[in-house]
Amino acid sequence: MRHFLPSLYTEAEPADIVMETAKGTYIGKFDRSNYDNSKPAEQQPIWSIKLVATPNDHTIQTLYPNGIKNPIFVWDQKESYQYKFALS
């Protein structure tokens, strides 16, 4: 299995996600409940992100009460994932 964000990812727990924005830092976790270990990482469904803390601003919780859906994944030439977030 190719590792997703090796510095943040572990086999046992979802990856912690840190988003730096103008309004503060948002902490989230991947929901990996639909992860299929029989498939390579690039064939996995898009994972949702559940926000678990918004220390500086609560606007994002109001706009996205169930977390941010459908982050945009980029498969780069080094076969590692990078990610971008669509907040609008």
Feature annotation, model-predicted:
Residues 1-88:
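Viral virion structural and adsorption modules
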